[in-house]
């Protein structure tokens, strides 16, 4: 019995070590996002997976970047795995601001290789609160204007669409576009020509 007890003890220790290693690996891969108060100030952080299991309990910052090309909005289809508005049309660039990351650095990281192009300067448009039955987000909306097809090709993905304001307006409230986009379009519609001039003008 004593030997059996030792074997069981060793197995328990090995099991705990494996369990802790797996937990540590999982935590390293976890996305940690800031928790904001109602004034938009960071008051802590939480794992994104935990936040998603508690609908609307926490307020998180995200960035969204509209893409303008030849006076049209560049839109792509969101993944079917997206937590909000899966399989709908939206901007190609959107991301959570991670804990201890700035909004500016998140914009650059989200743009990827386009951020290296000196002629592409993200311009801040508006900051607003987005809220539905799942999430509460402080959205920082930016715009970039692409001048060349080469730049456009850098953000090409599947199910791409270049939409004029009129084409988009005709399809609003039909489930085609993401909830974020639906809320932002009225603002974009009133400023899109200004925004294009603002970021593309000489």
In which residue ranges do the predicted regions lie?
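Short, small-hydrophobic-rich alpha-helical interface motif
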Residues: 40, 106-115
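Acidic surface patches and DE-rich sequence motifs
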Residues: 37, 69, 132
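A short coil-to-beta-strand element that immediately follows conserved catalytic motifs
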Residues: 117-126
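Nudix hydrolase/Nudix homology domain
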Residues: 1-16, 87-89, 99, 126-128, ...
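Conserved Nudix-box catalytic region and its N-terminal flanking loop in Nudix hydrolases
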Residues: 48-64, 68-109
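A generic fold-level signal
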Residues: 27-28, 58-60, 68, 134-137, ...
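Acidic, metal-coordinating catalytic segment for phosphate/diphosphate chemistry
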Residues: 20-64
């Amino acid at each position: 019995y004593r030997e059996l007890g030792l074997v069981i003890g060793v197995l328990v220790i090995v099991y705990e070590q494996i369990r802790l290693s797996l937990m540590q690996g999982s935590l390293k891969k976890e996305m940690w996002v800031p928790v904001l108060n109602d004034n938009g100030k960071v008051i802590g952080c939480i794992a994104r997976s935990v936040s998603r299991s508690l609908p609307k309990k926490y307020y998180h910052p995200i960035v969204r970047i509209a893409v303008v090309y030849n006076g049209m909005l560049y839109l792509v289809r969101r993944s079917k795995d997206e937590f909000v508005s899966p399989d709908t049309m939206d901007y190609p660039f959107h991301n959570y601001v991670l804990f201890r990351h700035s909004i500016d650095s998140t914009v650059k990281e989200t743009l990827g290789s386009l951020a290296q192009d000196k002629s592409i300067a993200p311009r801040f448009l508006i900051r607003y609160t987005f809220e539905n039955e799942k999430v509460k987000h402080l959205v920082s909306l930016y715009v970039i204007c692409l001048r060349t097809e080469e730049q456009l090709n850098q953000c090409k993905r599947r199910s791409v669409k270049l939409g004029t304001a009129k084409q988009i307006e005709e399809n609003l409230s039909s489930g085609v576009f993401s909830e974020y986009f639906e809320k932002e379009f009225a603002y974009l519609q009133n400023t899109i020509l200004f925004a294009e001039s603002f970021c593309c003008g000489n």
